[in-house]
A protein has these predicted regions:
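Generic beta-strand/beta-sheet core signal
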Residues: 50, 152, 175-177
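Gly/Ser/Thr-rich beta-alpha loop segments that engage phosphate groups in nucleotides
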Residues: 53, 155-157, 184-185, 190
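Residue-level detector of alpha-helix initiation sites
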Residues: 89, 155-156, 180
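Rossmann-like dinucleotide-binding cores of NAD(P)H-dependent redox enzymes
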Residues: 171-174, 178-195
């Protein structure tokens, strides 16, 4: 048997570090500290690579979670970012506000006795670091169709819809009654949760 099958025993789940209470009392920015590739790669290495990945099944977007965990374990950040973005218009947001403990992490096989892989932390690291390094999604169609779609509402659903259509070569115009896009992401989620 491969050594990979037992890393989850030796490497314990480590929650993301939070800023001190003294800092958080006067600062309403994001509460989690930045992490690094070593910590994230170590947590990603805990993934068993299940034959039937319940984490992927339980994710509403059916993200390729075991695949991008493997890529991060191998320090292949840009490929992991491409894969994250293939199924998700907002991986940088889902890594922060998605209730992973009820979805992907809640379905992780390791929950039975060993604690789940920190999937949300890894997803946040992948998208944040890739964006900081200038990464841009590569999945847009070079062939434009003759179609044009108008989308009412520039919230998460409207933006995700536009992004999906643009990937398929369909031009979009998004309309919203507010001056800034984002809907709930902009007007409903506090900055300490989504900066």
């Amino acid at each position: 048997m491969s050594e990979k099958n037992y890393e989850f025993i030796d490497i314990k789940r480590i929650e993301p570090e939070t800023k001190s209470l003294n800092v958080r009392k006067v600062d309403f920015s994001e509460i989690y500290e930045q992490t690094n590739i070593k910590k994230v790669s170590e947590q990603a290495s805990r993934c068993l690579g299940c034959g039937n990945p319940y984490c992927e099944w339980k994710c509403p977007l059916h993200n390729y979670i075991p695949d991008w965990l493997k890529l991060i374990e191998e320090n292949r950040l840009e490929e992991a970012a491409d894969l994250c973005h293939e199924t998700n218009a907002f991986p940088e947001i889902c890594g922060r506000i998605c209730p992973q403990e009820k979805l992907c992490e809640g379905a992780c096989t390791l929950n039975t006795g060993y604690e789940a892989v920190t999937i949300g932390q890894v997803e946040k690291y992948i998208s944040d670091t890739a964006l900081e390094q200038g990464w841009k999604p590569k999945k847009y169609s070079e062939k434009q169709t003759k179609f044009h779609v108008s989308i009412i509402g520039a919230g998460p659903a409207g933006i995700a819809c536009a992004e999906t259509l643009i990937r398929r070569g369909i031009n979009c115009t998004v309309y919203d009654k507010y001056s800034e896009i984002g809907g709930l992401l902009t007007y409903g989620i506090p900055v300490f949760k989504l900066e």
